[in-house]
Every structure is written in structure tokens, then in C-alpha cells.
Amino acid sequence: MTTEPGYLSPSVAVATSMPKRGVGAAVLIVPVVSTGEEDRPGAVVASAEPFLRADTVAEIEAGLRALDATGASDQVHRLAVPSLPVGSVLTVGLGKPRREWPADTIRCAAGVAARALNSSEAVITTLAELPGDGICSATVEGLILGSYRFSAFRSDKTAPKDAGLRKITVLCCAKDAKKRALHGAAVATAVATARDLVNTPPSHLFPAELAKRAKTLSESVGLDVEVIDEKALKKAGYGGVIGVGQGSSRPPRLVRLIHRGSRLAKNPQKAKKVALVGKGITFDTGGISIKPAASMHHMTSDMGGAAAVIATVTLAARLRLPIDVIATVPMAENMPSATAQRPGDVLTQYGGTTVEVLNTDAEGRLILADAIVRACEDKPDYLIETSTLTGAQTVALGTRIPGVMGSDEFRDRVAAISQRVGENGWPMPLPDDLKDDLKSTVADLANVSGQRFAGMLVAGVFLREFVAESVDWAHIDVAGPAYNTGSAWGYTPKGATGVPTRTMFAVLEDIAKNG
């Protein structure tokens, strides 16, 4: 058993023809679609040319008929096809035929196929040849994300016996296929890094350890790193981080990770600067306002925002984005104890705003407020901030759709990009009248309202108070989407999902390209 998590992503290669040798143990993943005949539903192979001969396609389709396959979405079948040099064929259903395929449909299909591979270590696929934008990258992302596993804390008795997916060969004739495939692999590997961090239990991942891992990851790609310990935080006036963390014997940290990408730009003076902020509550009991015991173990995921930000900024460095990206990551453990903050306490946030703590379980916004003010001191053009902020997010949008709040135009831009990459963020309003619900009789603000309703929006309004007026800002609330408590689906496993890593990185790419 190892206690150092780290999913080892498979290698990725691109080929323009079906390999003829050395693939006897590999599985060929082939997409199939429904025939559309209601009285006699069936499945036919999609995206076969130029990789499969007509007689091979006929052989696969005959096998599908024998299994009564319909080509429905997520339907998989394993076939022996003697005319091929591979060990077996795995077909994955896409549903009804389309002229062009949405990238996330292919990403999900690849993920479904990867989860059905069992002990197979090498795959070849024709999925990437389907028509549509971003299909090659999506294929690789789906295969890697779908094959993700986390077994660092399992003994030999329960650990997987196989090595997992180790090699992916993408069949694709596009000129930029290799570039697109490697891009998809890099993105998926970053998501896996975020998943690893979130899945690590709080016994092994506390503020100092999370800071250490963030530092190690960041230095490996050349980022500048600053780790601020509890003494320095207190001296500098980070009242939110200190207040939340003071109940734990494991003190808080704040980490700054800096990618100086403007020097890679054609015109460095015009390169944009983006601030990232992610909530790093390594475990959240709720503090004195303690949570119910039944689902408290899921609060190992309360640093999902921090994990995504760490993964995103390291990916920006790895892929050499020509913009400056500065991540500010506050880290604390929210515990009840004789030294914990109490409901009714008043703390002074970094920057001087005073906050009455009416509920110690609304702690994320307190550490985020400190980090936001610090991030805005760098005078960024944009601020993207993410956290498992509110249970109200799941009430409003469910467990798969992040809520996106912030400056209207930038909020909509982030939400649109999130939908394009398949993380499906949805824009939410921040009505000005909700600020009245945050009035305090003893401080500048209260950390919660006295109302039952609009909890996500109230939290967003609270955070907005700490954002500089000159900064375009978006907050992504991933309270539900960051951690899947149900069954695996598509390329999403049970447990940590890595959301919203892909959204944030795609926004960075968009800013690098379009300003």
C-alpha cells in the first residue's frame, strides 16, 4: 500500500492506419450508432473508413446483431473479430447518427468504453475520426478520465490486480491530430491531479501537506511559489483564514503559485493577467455550527476548488500559455474545539473589512474573502474563483451543474465555455437587494443572511464585496459537481471529479487567444 496518491496517465500515440503487429493484447474501441428502425432496432459501425475493411465492418455488425445491440448511448459490447490483429473489439453506442458530433458526447462515450475495459492495458480507437470540433482531444480526455482510478490507500487484499490503462493509440487522419491528442492528454492528466488531491483522505491531506504538494507540483513546471504559514498570516492580517483555522491543531496556510506567461507572448505588454482563487478547506466539520454526521465524510472534498486551481495553474505552465496566471489558495481545516471561532465572533478580513460570524459552517467565504483581496492587489484583468461554496447550489442546480456568478459579461463568458467543454456551468444572478440580508449590528457584514432562500446567491453577494471594482470576476460554485457521491457515469468516477479544472483552463486559453 502507498499513501502517496498519483494516477499514472497512459501514454498517447496517433496513427493513420490500423497497427498490424504487437497489438494482440489490445482492445479496439469502435463507435456504433442506431439504425433508426423502430420495428427492428439495430447498430451499425460509425467512423470505420479508412481504418477498417468492409468485410471487417460486416463481421462486427454481424456480431452486434447476434447480441441484439441497438447502438443506444452508453451501450457497450465486447466482440471477438478474427480478421483483426487485436485481442477483441469493444463497441460503444452513440445513439442516433449525426452529421457532426458534440465533443462531450464523444468524451462521454470514450469514458464509458474506458470504464468497461476491465483489465485491458492498451486500446486503439476510431472514435477520433468522427466529424465534429475537438473530437480528437475529447476522445483522449474521455479515455483517460474514464480509466482513472484511486487506490493509494487500499491494501493488497482489495487493490486492483491489473495495471490499468497504460497505452492509447488514436486512429486519426487529421494533420494536427498528434497536437490535439497530446493537448487532450495534458488536460485530462491535470484533472486527474485534482481528483487525486480531493480523494486523498483528510488524515493525510491537511493544510501544511496540501501546501507541500502544491509546491512540489508547481516547482516541477517552473512556477514561482510562496507558502505563507500561520504566523505570517496572522501578522499580515489574514483574519478569515486564521479565524477558520484556529480550531484545528493543524494550522492554516496560504499558497501563491505564479505562472509568468507574458514573457512567452508576442507582445508581453499586452498580455493579460488572470488571478485564480480556490477554496482549500481540507476538512469541514462545520466548526461549532457542526454538520450532521450522516454525510460529513464527504467533506474531504471541501478543498475541491483549491485542487482545481492548483491543477489549472500547473497546466497553464506545462502548456506554456502566454498570459500571467497567479493562483492564491487559502487552506484551513474547520474543526470544533476550545479554540475554534464561535457564532457571534467578529473577525477582520485581510484588507480591513469586519465580519460577524453568525454561522461557522459558512467558513469557505471567509477564507476566500482574504484570498480575493490579496489576489486583487496584483491588479489582474480577470479573477476566476471556485469553491464548494454552498449546499444551496445543489438545491438550485443539482449535482452536475455548477453555478457561475460574477460580473455579468465575464460570468456569461465563463458559463458558455464551461458548457462547451462539458462541465455545464450555468449563469446565476447576484441581485443587489440581497446585500441587505448581510447587514450586521456589530460589524461591516454578516457571513450569512437570516433567510432560508437564495443561499448560493447570498454567498456570491458576500464575495463580491471583496472584489476590486476594476476586475472582471467569476465565481464557480461546485458544491455538488466537485464530488460524485453516486454511481460512475460517462467519464466521471465515483468520488472526486476534478470539476471545474477543464472550465478554468479553457477560459485561460480563451483569454490568451482573444484577450
Curated annotation (Swiss-Prot):
What are the BP-aspect GO terms?
proteolysis
Q: Does the keyword Lipid biosynthesis apply?
A: no
Positions binding Mn(2+) 1 in this chain are D284, D361, E363
Q: What are the entry keywords?
A: Aminopeptidase, Cytoplasm, Hydrolase, Manganese, Metal-binding, Protease
Q: Which residues form the active site?
A: K291, R365
Which prosthetic group or cofactor does it need? Mn(2+)
| Pfam families named in the record | Peptidase_M17, Peptidase_M17_N
Query: From what superkingdom does this record's organism come?
Result: Bacteria
The residues listed in the UniProt record as binding Mn(2+) 2, with positions renumbered to this chain, are K279, D284, D302, E363
Q: How is the cofactor bound, as the UniProt entry phrases it?
A: Binds 2 manganese ions per subunit.
Q: Which GO terms describe its molecular function?
A: manganese ion binding; metalloaminopeptidase activity
Say which enzyme class the record assigns.
Answer: hydrolase
Where is it mostly found? cytoplasm
Localization, per the record, is:
Cytoplasm
An example of a Gene Ontology cellular component annotation for this protein is: cytoplasm
Q: Would the keyword Cytoplasm turn up in this protein's UniProt record?
A: yes
Which EC number applies?
3.4.11.1, 3.4.11.10
Q: Which PANTHER family match?
A: CYTOSOL AMINOPEPTIDASE, LEUCINE AMINOPEPTIDASE-RELATED
Q: What is this protein's record name?
A: Probable cytosol aminopeptidase
Q: Give the originating organism.
A: Mycobacterium bovis (strain ATCC BAA-935 / AF2122/97)
